[in-house]
Amino acid sequence: MFIYDDNFLSLEQILELSQSVTKDNKDIIWHALKGTTDIKQYPEIKNSNMTVSEDGQTVHAASFNETRLSEIHDLGSNILHIFAKKHGIEIKEILRIKANILSKTEKQDHIHPPHVDMTIPHLVLLYYVNDSDGDTVMFDQKYCAEETPTLTVNKTIAPKAGAAILFDGLTYHSSSSPKNTEERIVLNINFLTV
């Protein structure tokens, strides 16, 4: 399953999100992390000139296991429910909502380690808060605990403010840091369906 939608929120909602989910919002507690994942062994990527390496990222945890940790939970939950209603998806439980900020890098043809957010069946809604050139890379392969697969790129998605992608949470994916814009800001929502 993969859905791309850049026409499910009003312009007012898109602007509210872009003004709320920033480093400048003093109501949000941001944490600087050394990497985007905790993966130690990177999967190989076939037929690609992409180099896999880490960059630091700034993260805000908005909710975890249905526990609301900040106002960003409400914004993320609202985005998810609007998207789900439009696409006929029944939400059972929100597992996690977090905001990620990746800063500009000089690295070329570089992506972060391919990963899955959780190793249980779930869906991911990735909402792009701002326009950026830090693409998301989707792979054909799914997570399997017994092996680290060789990956093939399925598609890349350029971040566009107000757009979101929905995909099977067991599908390997990667982020990348922007090279031309200052920041790439996303809301990452992991959830279960009925």
Model regions: which residues?
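Non-heme Fe(II)/2-oxoglutarate
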Residues: 1-90
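Catalytic core of non-heme Fe(II) oxygenases with the double-stranded beta-helix
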Residues: 69-77, 81-187, 192-194
